[in-house]
Amino acid sequence: PWVKENADAFLVQWYAGEEQGNSAADILLGNVNPSGKLNVSFPRSTGNTPCYYNYLPTDKEYYDNLGGSPDSPAARYIFEKPYALWNFGYGLSYSDFNYVSCELGASEYDSANGVIRAEVEVENVSDRDGKEVVQLYIRDLLSSVATPIKQLKAFKKVLVPAHGKVKVSLEVPVDELSLYNERMQRVVEPGDFEIQIGSSSDCIQFRDTVSVR
C-alpha cells in the first residue's frame, strides 16, 4: 500500500477530542514521545477483512498457498497474502528498545490456583527516555476444541530511561487459560502452553513452554 511505501510513520489518533490538534502537534514536534500500541490489526485492503491476530488454526494452508487472480479467481476472494499491514499491538516510538532476557517463575503450574509469572528485562538503546508496552501472549498447544493461535493475556507499559534497563513483571492466573469444552463447561484443560513475550503480536522476542497439571 502507498502509505507504508511512502511514509516513515503513520499517526493514529482515533477520537482524540477537542485537544486532538495540540496532541498531534506535540507528537510531530517531538515534545512528547509516543508509546501507544494498536488495539486492532490494520488490513492491507478492504479485500483482506476480517483481519485479526487471534484467528483459529486451519488445515487449509490459507496463508501460504494462495491461488487465484482477478482474471482467474479459483476458490479465492483474496489475491494476496492476507497478512496485516500493521499488526495488533504494534506501535512506534522515538526510542528504540531491545528485549534482553525473559525468565519464567516455573515450568509447571497447578490448574486450581496457579499463577504464571514472567520477568522481562527491556533496554532502551536510544538517547531519549521512552515508554515500552511489554506484551505476553499464550497459545494452547493442544486442546479439545479449536482455540486461537495466540491470545494477549498480560501487558505492562514501563518507562525506560535512555541507555537504561528495566525489569518488567507480568502475571497470568492459570484460570485465564480456561475454555468452553464441547459440553459448554468452562474448564482449564491440562497440557502444554506456549508463552510468547514481545512488543506486538507479530514481533515475539521470547518463547517458552509451560505445563498445567
PLM features: residue spans?
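Secreted, periplasmic, or luminal enzymes acting at the cell surface/secretory milieu
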Residues: W2-K131, Y137, P190, E194-G198, ...
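Residue-level signal for secondary-structure boundary sites
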Residues: S107, R128, S144, E176-S178, ...
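Intrinsic-disorder/low-complexity, polar/charged segments enriched in Ser/Thr/Lys/Arg/Asp/Glu/Gln
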Residues: V115-R117, K165-S169, Q205-R207
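Hydrophobic alpha-helical segments
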Residues: S143, V158, Q196-S200
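Intrinsically disordered, low-complexity Pro/Gly/Ser/Thr-rich segments with frequent PxxP/GP/PP motifs
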Residues: S144-Y180, M184
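Terminal connector regions
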Residues: P173-R213
